[in-house]
């Protein structure tokens, strides 16, 4: 039994099994880079920037983003090297199966499933909140009973009833994203690239117009003096802020799950991973620099620091609605990439079994938790159908877990790495 648990699959067999699959190689470096940017840039650029600057790093938050970006780049290099050697879907699940054995692969595979599950479900809740705010800007009010979860997690009380019926916007966006993914990877990639272009354009718009209202006085001192407590300003604050804004980089590993659909995975996947990290780091640094320059950093201690910065300069209030649109677009692409990546984890266990893998822990469906139908390919579209249709079922619980899902997803990502 121990021998089976530690058994590995030769790289040649993994590659051969992947080549015999029905997935088409249609994604180039630009599409893969867009996948990475789509997965990484969500609300982190609009939320974490202000909180980390106000409470930890001050204007030096730009250094925190650079430090976090460099750390992610090292992890990205590992993913890039593995993706070049083992150009199949499955990401860390397939890599660990080739190197560490079936049991470790099974453990990492389910951690990836949890990462994408809680990530997409939590982001759907956040998407709902931004859509409600956007509708309110046009004087359209959605009843609270249809925009909140019937259950919430209260500290010290566990699950409590909220009196709401269901989070209708969250359910609808999951259904829409599922439909896009079932249509096919080419269509999904096109929609993702379009959404990424919209949200990046809005971020650049805020940076460009906000730069005219930057005051160098707000950047002095660049690294505020430490308050006497570790992590509150000073260099310790810069490092602590780097750990906080690390959450804003989660998702770049999703690029590796599309290796089996890359035209030239040995070249395109590394470009997609590292290219997306460079673009995201650049946008994060510029946005944080502009925000801390527009007003004193203590005033950014708000869950919506961009809105606070815009309100401090009435001439920029017209950017409020574009920022909401950018947040909605950002979260939409995050959901799309997360759900696409999870289907790849489900699908890889299916074709590994078809390639002759022993029936044991390496097949997630053999664990008795994942149904054998999950991961089945719809041959006319080369996409996983059952893995996508399980997502609305997961969301039927309607538990409002937006804040908790960030920590669950981060923990799963670190364990899988």
Report residues per predicted region.
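Membrane-interface "cap" regions at the ends of multi-pass membrane proteins
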Residues: 1-50, 54-59, 72-77, 86-89, ...
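Helix-loop-helix junctions that connect adjacent transmembrane segments
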Residues: 13-24, 62, 139-170, 194-320, ...
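Extracellular loop-to-transmembrane helix junctions
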Residues: 24, 45-157, 165, 236, ...
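Loop-to-transmembrane helix boundary motifs in multi-pass membrane proteins
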Residues: 24, 29, 167-171, 263-284, ...
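Select transmembrane alpha-helical segments in multipass membrane proteins
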Residues: 25-36, 101-114, 169-173, 231-245, ...
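Transmembrane helix-loop boundary segments of multi-pass membrane transporters
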Residues: 51-57, 61, 112, 123-130, ...
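Membrane-helix boundary/coupling elements in multi-pass transport proteins
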Residues: 74, 88, 111-129, 244, ...
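Hydrophobic alpha-helical segments of multi-pass membrane transport proteins
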Residues: 133, 202-206, 345-346, 394-417
């Amino acid at each position: 039994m121990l021998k089976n648990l530690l058994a590995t699959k030769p790289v040649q067999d993994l590659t051969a099994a992947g080549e015999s699959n029905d997935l088409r190689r249609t994604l180039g470096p630009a599409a893969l880079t867009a996948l990475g940017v789509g997965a990484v840039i969500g609300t982190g650029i609009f939320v974490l920037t202000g909180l980390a600057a106000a409470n930890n790093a001050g204007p030096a938050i730009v250094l925190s983003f650079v430090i976090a970006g460099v750390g992610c780049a090292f992890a990205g290099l590992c993913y890039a090297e593995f993706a070049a050697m083992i150009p199949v879907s499955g990401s860390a699940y397939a890599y660990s199966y080739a190197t560490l054995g079936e049991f470790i692969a099974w453990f990492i595979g389910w951690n990836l499933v949890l990462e994408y599950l809680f990530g997409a479900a939590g982001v759907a809740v956040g998407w709902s909140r931004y859509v409600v705010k956007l509708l309110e800007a046009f004087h359209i009010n959605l009843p609270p009973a249809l925009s909140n979860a019937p259950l919430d997690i209260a500290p010290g009380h566990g699950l409590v009833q909220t009196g709401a019926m269901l989070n209708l916007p969250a359910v609808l966006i999951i259904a829409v994203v599922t439909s896009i993914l079932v249509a096919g990877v080419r269509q999904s990639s096109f929609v993702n690239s379009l959404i990424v272009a919209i949200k990046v354009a809005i971020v650049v718009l805020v940076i460009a117009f906000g730069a005219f209202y930057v005051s160098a006085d707000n950047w002095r001192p660049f690294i505020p003096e430490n308050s006497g407590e570790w992590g509150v300003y000073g260099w310790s604050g810069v490092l602590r802020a780097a750990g906080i804004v690390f959450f804003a980089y989660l998702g770049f590993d999703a690029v590796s799950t599309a290796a089996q659909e890359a035209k030239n995975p040995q070249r395109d996947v590394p470009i997609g991973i590292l290219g997306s990290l460079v673009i995201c780091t650049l946008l994060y640094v510029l946005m944080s620099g502009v925000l801390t320059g527009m007003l004193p950093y203590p005033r950014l201690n708000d869950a919506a620091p961009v809105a606070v910065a815009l309100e401090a300069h009435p001439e920029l209030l017209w950017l409020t609605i574009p920022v909401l649109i950018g947040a909605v677009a950002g979260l939409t692409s995050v959901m799309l990439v997360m759900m696409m990546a999870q289907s790849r984890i489900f699908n890889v266990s299916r074709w590994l079994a078809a390639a002759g893998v022993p029936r044991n822990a390496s097949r997630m469906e053999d664990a008795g938790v994942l149904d054998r139908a999950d991961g089945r390919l719809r041959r006319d579209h080369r996409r996983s159908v059952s893995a996508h249709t399980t997502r609305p079922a997961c969301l039927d619980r309607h538990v409002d877990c937006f804040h908790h899902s960030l920590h669950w997803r981060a923990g799963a990502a670190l364990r899988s790495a």
